[in-house]
Each structure stands twice: as C-alpha cells, then as structure tokens.
Design a protein with these regions (language model features):
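Structural signature of nuclease core domains in nucleic-acid processing machines
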Residues: 435-560
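Phosphate-binding site recognition
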Residues: 1-456, 471-473
Length: 560
C-alpha cells in the first residue's frame, strides 16, 4: 500500500492544501453555485459526514477578499475557468460561520456557546474597530459582541450587522456562508429548549431577508427545516437536498473518485469490501460513498493492511435517532424493520420540510428523518420495480455499516424493553419445569422482537440469552459443555439450580416438534448436564425449537 496523507478529522480546506493532504477535487461546486442566476440564498442539506464543512471552507478560501489563495486552487478543476476566477477569486468580502459546536443541556449553556461562536467570528474582523467607515455606535456593539456581553437583540442581529459593516468597508456586497445551521435547534429539541433556540436562530437568519449588503448566501445543514419556521420572508431561496441532482457529486465520493483513491493508495483489492460497507447512498441521480468512512478505512489500512471494514458511525450520538424511532413506533414498525434488515425495500411517504419539534408526531416523519439523515436511502430502480405514488419513496438500508448500526440498536432496544417487562411468570415456568407456560411466555416475547438475521441461529441465541440478562442470573451463551456446546446456560447459585437450553431452528412449522425432540436428545447425547451434578441441587434441561416467531419448549429434569 502507498502511504497517503489522509486528512481524517480535518475540514479546513487551506490546511489540507497547504500541508499536502490527499484531496478529492470538489472545486466544481464553485462554478455550479455561481451558475445559478437570480438565486440569493441556497440551502444545501446532506447527512452528517458527507463533506459539507470542507465544502464551505473551500468556498470561503475561494471568495474571501482578505485572502490570496490562487496557489491553493492550482491544478483544481475551477482553475480552468480563468474568467470566473478573475472575477470571483478572493475578490469579495466573505463571512463564514459554523454552528456545529452549539450545544448544551439547557438554553443558557447553549446560548453561551453561540455567543462564543459569534465572538470568534467578529475577532476575524477587528479592522472594523479602526475603520473610519464604521460609526462609534456600531463599534460599541462590535466590542460587546467580541466580549460576549451584547444584548440578545444585538446577538440575533449580529450577522446582519456584520454584512452591513463589511459592505460599508469594502464597497461590495458580502458572501455569507453558514455551516450546520440546524445543529443548534436539533440539540435544543433533544434537550427541551427548542422554542428559545429557534427564536435566536430566526433572528440570526434575518441577515438573509431584504439585506442590501448581501451578495448571496450558501447554507448547509442536515434537515431542510420548514421555511416558515426559520427562513420566514427569505426571497430568491432555493434548496438542494438528497433528492435533487444538481450538486450531489460534490458531497460524498462518486465511483470514479473512489476508484482513483484506491488506485493512488494501491489498494484496489479492497474495492468490493469498501463498496459493501460504505457505498449505497443514492442521492438524486448519483450513487455516492460516505467520504468520512472511506478516508477512515484508508487510514486504518495504512496502519494495518489486513484491517477489515468497521462502522465509523457507530459511536456517535447521532445514532440515537434510530433508537428514538424504535422507541416511538415499537411493534408498529417491526415488519418494516425486518424487511429492511433482510435487504429489502419499503415504501414510505417522505416529507423534506420537517421541523424538529414535530419529528415524533407521526411515523412518516420518523421515516423521513431516517432518510434525510443517511440511515436509509432511496432504492435504485433495479432494487425496486413497483409503481410509486406521488410523495412516496422506496427506501432501503444503504450498506453493511448502517445495517450493523440498526442491528446493534435493535439488540439494545430488545434487551432494554425485555428488562422492563414482567418476566416473573416466565422465570417461574423455567424453575418449575413448566414447559407449557414457558412456551406461551416465550412466544409472547418473540412476537415483540425485531428479527435482524433472517431468523437464523444467532438471532435465537441472542433472544434466549437476552431474556435472562439483567434479571439477577448468571448467563453463559455457547459455552463448552461435555462433548459439545450448549446454547445457553442460566445459573441461579443462591437457590443452587441451573437451567440448560439447547435451541434449534427450522424452516418449516411442521418440524417444530421434531426439532424440539432433537434438541432434548442432543442434551442427552452430549451430556451437557454432567458437569453440574456435583454443584447444583436442581438441574433442568430444555430443548427449544424456533420457526420464525413461534417456538416450542420441552423439558428434561436431570436432577430435582
């Protein structure tokens, strides 16, 4: 493998270019945006980790009149457009602000973070304090914004003020770049101060409305919050979402780019596994890979050439959206989730104009959220051949990485929900050797589960072990016993008793009883109970057979 300087965690365009980091050329975005005549405000929504912040940093580097970045764009696609570069490269006053760090458990702490962001933004423009084109009243407000002592009114008006002052300073209208505009309201919705933060963000976005100092604005986020909620009164406003085609090649890696990356890194043999794990997003007319994942995996391959693909989304707080969805919808969406986890598609109505406070108001809103945040994607035509009604989309899980996240979440959800339900009748049936009631109680639990492995052995083993986890028992799964492996062993040392479970699964209902008998026979033949005879007063053995969401239990008392 060839060593490349992989910029994982670096979203600053200038840092990447100056330090010689590997860069996939997305400069065509500049020409695409400038080619949209008559558009004052462009909102671009994509899932997290698809290069939005890096793209915005590139725009700032290209337009900002305070910079001289011609060298950084040499050999990039945009440099071929000489007249455009003459007119626009480092010729326009530019404001770039990102709200992705604005978070807090309550409104006051989040508001403090926001005022810090505004303060740091104004520190980039200290020249305004010395300018004879800025009056003393405005200079005083600028000082207060820098110090973090400005009133709420002036904080809300800070972007409007900055564009006006820069217009006065340079005599040119200002380009305004706002990154991750929806993070503050998303965090606010999660922590119970949505209305307060929405009011602040509405104020900040007044810079987009009837602003003579504005040349144009580009805004990025995850969701297209309903215009009437946050962009009230904004004219000449267009949005570009994952259902559109115009800009989709600029966010995420298309196949030709991934092919070139793998060639440059000399890891073409990893193409199939990278496609399986990190491809599969169908945005507009483009199939794209998640760039965050591809770059992380390439970096890992440089450390360990034998490294297998893993989920790089797995340990992020954003994944809570799946859990909240399952918690809300519960058994109502079990069948749909099982279809998705089996590699199938489901058809749902999708609304791109959501507001965070209404995300949980309907099942459709939650499916829309999973789609817009990248946990589901639009199925390709070859993956779904049915006819779709207006406003509906055929959805599927994009790749192995996201499937693993769903599976992990489903397991945790089942474990948690099982712990909350009353299992005393089931436990009594186990220790009383009541296979009839045990069959009944297990069937009830099975109907509440979400299958994530096409009803194969590992699904049933996890189900069986999960029933007893967190209930005060010791649980062993697939431990070596006698001449083989029993599936699950449950220990109750306080009462000196142990229950041994051997599970079988069958593909037909009529074999349920015979497989149950086979499980009992296996316990006998392989002497699973023998090692417990000296240490426990009561040993109960159970054979269980499963068919989809049905089961049968039979018992064998070894020692009572």
């Amino acid at each position: 493998m060839k060593l490349l300087s992989i910029p994982v965690g670096v979203s600053d365009f200038e840092e990447i270019r100056r330090n010689g980091y590997y860069y996939v050329d997305k400069s065509g975005l500049i020409g695409e945006l400038l080619g949209t005549t008559g558009t004052k405000v462009t909102l671009i929504t994509r899932p997290r980790r698809f290069g939005k912040t890096l793209g915005m940093s590139m725009l700032e580097s290209f337009f900002d009149i305070q910079k001289d970045n011609k060298a950084l764009f040499e050999e990039l696609e945009i440099a071929k457009r000489h007249e455009l570069c003459m007119e626009w490269m480092n010729q326009w006053p530019t404001v770039f602000v990102s709200f992705r760090q604005v978070d807090g458990l309550n409104f006051n702490s989040a508001y403090d973070m926001l005022t810090l962001v505004i303060s740091e933004l104004y520190k980039k423009h200290l020249y305004l304090l010395d300018s004879d084109k800025v009056d003393s009243f405005d200079k005083e407000i600028v000082k207060q914004l820098i110090q973090g002592t400005a009133s709420a009114k002036d904080t809300k008006g800070s972007l409007m003020l900055l564009t006006r002052l820069m217009y006065q300073q340079y005599g040119k209208p200002v380009i305004l770049l706002i990154d991750e505009y929806d993070v503050p309201v998303a965090k606010a919705n999660s922590n119970g101060y949505y209305e307060e933060m929405l009011d602040v963000m509405k104020g900040l976005m007044q810079a987009l409305k009837d602003n003579q100092a504005l040349c144009f604005a580009v805004i990025t986020g995850c969701l297209k919050i309903a215009k009437e909620s946050i962009f009230t009164g904004t004219n000449n406003f267009i949005s570009d979402t994952i259902t559109d085609s115009r800009l989709n090649e600029y966010f995420g890696f298309v196949q030709s780019e991934v092919d070139q990356i793998l060639k440059d890194a000399d890891v073409l043999d990893k193409a199939e596994s990278i496609r399986e794990w990190y491809d599969g997003y169908h945005f507009g007319d483009f199939d794209v890979y998640c760039p965050w994942d591809v770059m992380n995996y390439l970096l890992e391959l440089q450390r360990n050439p034998k490294a297998k693909p893993v989920s790089y989304w797995k340990n992020t707080s954003d994944n809570a959206v799946i859990r909240s969805f399952i918690d809300y919808a519960g058994s109502n969406i079990t069948g749909k989730l099982e279809t998705l986890l089996a590699g199938g598609t489901i058809v749902q109505r999708v609304d791109e104009n959501l507001t965070y406070d209404y995300l949980h108001s309907s099942e459709n809103n939650l499916w829309s959220m999973l789609y817009l945040t990248g946990y589901l994607t639009k199925a390709r035509e070859e993956d779904y051949n049915g006819k779709l009604a207006d406003g509906t989309v055929a959805l599927m899980i994009p790749n192995a990485e996201i499937k693993e996240i769903f599976e992990t979440t489903v397991i945790k959800w089942f474990d948690d929900s099982t712990k909350k339900c009353d299992r005393s009748t089931l436990f009594d049936a186990v220790w009383n050797g009541d296979s009839g009631n045990l069959t009944k109680e297990m069937n009830v639990l099975l109907r509440r589960t979400i299958s994530y492995h096409d009803y194969k052995e590992d699904f049933y083993h996890a189900f069986l072990a999960g029933i007893f986890t967190g209930a005060g028992y010791m649980v062993d799964s697939n431990k070596e016993h006698g001449e083989g492996r029993s599936d699950v062993v449950v220990y109750d040392p306080i009462n000196s008793r142990v229950a041994i479970f051997e599970a079988k699964y069958t593909k037909s209902l009529d074999k349920l009883e015979s497989e149950c008998d086979a499980a009992i026979q296996q316990i006998d033949d392989r002497m699973y109970a023998k090692e417990y005879e000296d240490d426990y007063d009561q040993i109960l053995c159970y054979g269980i057979s499963f068919f989809k969401k049905r089961c049968m239990v039979k018992k064998k008392l070894v020692k009572t």
